[in-house]
Amino acid sequence: MKPDAHQVKQFLLNLQDTICQQLSAVDGAEFVEDSWQREAGGGGRSRVLRNGGVFEQAGVNFSHVHGEAMPASATAHRPELAGRSFEAMGVSLVVHPHNPYVPTSHANVRFFIAEKPGAEPVWWFGGGFDLTPFYGFEEDAIHWHRTARDLCLPFGEDVYPRYKKWCDEYFYLKHRNEQRGIGGLFFDDLNTPDFDHCFAFMQAVGKGYTDAYLPIVERRKAMAYGERERNFQLYRRGRYVEFNLVWDRGTLFGLQTGGRTESILMSMPPLVRWEYDYQPKDGSPEAALSEFIKVRDWV
């Protein structure tokens, strides 16, 4: 089947609505919407929930940008895109909870298509979701990865292991020699065997995110915590900022190509702290995190 960008856009708009409704139902607060237009073509809907009952900040962004030609930074890596008009659309979200026992989560699904008259379109899907705990709970990690594995199974037995590995490799802070969290799924450049198959997989990932995340939120949101746990959460959020500004391809691409800065940086935690040469106490739950986030097979 020929790629249908309109069908993908409708799914993404509905996905943004659904995820916002689900997060609001857990939190009790509502999202505030900020619609925006891009001068060069396209626009989006940024939605943010701040200082809710459960979430300190949750941002769910939809964007759809288009143009007559790709930026040089993109065609340098993919010369086949030169001289083509393009559309790029996606939903991207990050949730930063109040409670340090509730992990931070991130999800993204996206579609890209570049066309020119008389030629076959170049298109692909990408996306995934990943979890960043501050305190490790094995049952949460197993549930997260089991949900990821189960949504992948209809698409092939090799899909989950392949995209889990890609996620582990992508969300890695080289300058710290550590993972950002416990991973999940990450895929890009997906365009085989055909459009329908790839679109169905992207939909499964988009819908699977809340199945993976919300049970963990419900399990942990009422756990008692104090200043020690909060300080550790803020310290570990620093790793999130470091990854996004130093290593994340999407953030860098957006900032380098004149994307909407407010939406791109919506993923940042509202409060964060750094501490020189921080060393957690031996045997403490904080010290256990470095071992917990090391790459392993959870299911």
Swiss-Prot record:
Keyword flag NAD: no
Positions marked as site (Important for dimerization): 175
GO biological process: protoporphyrinogen IX biosynthetic process
Binding-site residues for Mn(2+), renumbered to this chain: 96, 106, 145, 175
Keyword Manganese in annotation: yes
Single GO cellular component term: cytoplasm
GO molecular function: coproporphyrinogen oxidase activity; manganese ion binding; protein homodimerization activity
Cofactor(s) needed for function: Mn(2+)
Compartment annotation: Cytoplasm
TM regions (residue ranges): none
Residues annotated to bind substrate: 92, 108-110, 258-260
PROSITE patterns xrefs: COPROGEN_OXIDASE
Region (Important for dimerization): 240-275
NCBIfam families listed in its UniProt record: PRK05330.1 (NF003727)
Job description of the protein: Involved in the heme biosynthesis. Catalyzes the aerobic oxidative decarboxylation of propionate groups of rings A and B of coproporphyrinogen-III to yield the vinyl groups in protoporphyrinogen-IX.
Family: Belongs to the aerobic coproporphyrinogen-III oxidase family.
Oligomeric form and interacting partners: Homodimer.
Name of the protein in its database record: Oxygen-dependent coproporphyrinogen-III oxidase
Organism: Escherichia coli O1:K1 / APEC
